[in-house]
Amino acid sequence: MSETAKKVIVGMSGGVDSSVSAWLLQQQGYQVEGLFMKNWEEDDGEEYCTAAADLADAQAVCDKLGIELHTVNFAAEYWDNVFELFLAEYKAGRTPNPDILCNKEIKFKAFLEFAAEDLCADYIATGHYVRRAXVDGKSRLLRGLDSNKDQSYFLYTLSHEQIAQSLFPVGELEKPQVRKIAEDLGLVTAKKKDSTGICFIGERKFRKFLGRYLPAQPGKIITVDGDEIGEHQGLMYHTLGQRKGLGIGGTKDGTEEPWYVVDKDVENNILIVAQGHEHPRLMSVGLIAQQLHWVDREPFTGTMRCTVKTRYRQTDIPCTVKALDADRIEVIFDEPVAAVTPGQSAVFYNGEVCLGGGIIEQRLPLPV
């Protein structure tokens, strides 16, 4: 079988990126089929029923392109492998990233296995803005060509074997080009806005949604000087560096600086705040990361120089990484960084290549 006749299953989300991905693969000569994944059981009425609309859009695109659309329900896998861990992290006072977990457990595990075993696919494809390239005989993950849309941060858990079985057609394009292709083709998704919110759970009100699964525990808001200035409705609703939603307007000592979350005392259910987004308590000189995933799957020992992102869309931070043991590293930044958040991911790069990453276990605060 020639390379161009190979079978690709495209994860069709009902969005513009996966729609255009399917068309691009058709142009490249692949045998293309679509798969719509239902990963959440809707139980709260019409207001949040986005899955049905997304499925209708995915079906309309597949009809237009003349390709078959399969559907699969991964709700049980999502609940067990993504959502329960997501809740446990919030309960522990950390701020997890469910999109990274979802890519790891659903899109590049459950989907990959289903496509290969049930649909006899040679590859899967998604609408992620990343690229792949072979380096030293292994498939590597590269940043997407569109630096504004690069999604390699969310895919750092992938192994070189998973990347070798995955295609990322829009990673070579910029977003406006993708929308233009969709418009020229007359696809219903051409002007559909990009999805935000929790992976697969959609745009629902986050605080209300989380409150259904984790009972909120109100507690004190205390300044770094120890003054009590308000009450929070639950530590889980707040993250380091947060400014909005604290409900403690006004100023102190005549300064006009707004209040920011600088720490959480989980044991005592206290939210600690300070004024100014560059307050020393918000700054870190480094971090400790665990649950490491290196794309080449080679164990990391010794030290290395590279860059790191501690959150999506952050400018790369030059740093030195040192192995502490098989599954923990210490990262020291060249310059202090604000709002390094336990539970989020630290993702490492060498130029365009995403090396891998890990979960931030603790931040190393600026010495006082």
UniProtKB/Swiss-Prot annotation:
Alphabetical UniProt keywords: ATP-binding, Cytoplasm, Disulfide bond, Nucleotide-binding, RNA-binding, Transferase, tRNA processing, tRNA-binding
Catalytic reaction list: S-sulfanyl-L-cysteinyl-[protein] + uridine(34) in tRNA + AH2 + ATP = 2-thiouridine(34) in tRNA + L-cysteinyl-[protein] + A + AMP + diphosphate + H(+)
Top-level lineage group: Bacteria
Residue positions binding ATP: 11-18, 37, 127
Region annotation (Interaction with tRNA) ranges: 149-151, 311-312
SUPFAM superfamilies for this protein: Adenine nucleotide alpha hydrolases-like
Disulfide cross-links: 102-199
CDD domains: MnmA_TRMU-like
Entry annotation: catalytic residues: 102 (nucleophile), 199 (cysteine persulfide intermediate)
Chain positions covered by the region annotation Interaction with target base in tRNA: 97-99
Role noted for this protein: Catalyzes the 2-thiolation of uridine at the wobble position (U34) of tRNA(Lys), tRNA(Glu) and tRNA(Gln), leading to the formation of s(2)U34, the first step of tRNA-mnm(5)s(2)U34 synthesis. Sulfur is provided by IscS, via a sulfur-relay system. Binds ATP and its substrate tRNAs.
HAMAP family associated with the record: tRNA_thiouridyl_MnmA
Complex and partners: Interacts with TusE.
PANTHER family given in the database record: MITOCHONDRIAL TRNA-SPECIFIC 2-THIOURIDYLASE 1 (PTHR11933:SF5), TRNA 5-METHYLAMINOMETHYL-2-THIOURIDYLATE -METHYLTRANSFERASE (PTHR11933)
Alphabetical list of NCBIfam families matching this protein: PRK00143.1, trmU
Family designation: Belongs to the MnmA/TRMU family.
The protein, known as: tRNA-specific 2-thiouridylase MnmA
Organism (species): Escherichia coli O6:H1 (strain CFT073 / ATCC 700928 / UPEC)
Lineage of source species: Bacteria, Pseudomonadati, Pseudomonadota, Gammaproteobacteria, Enterobacterales
Name of the gene encoding the protein in the UniProt record: mnmA
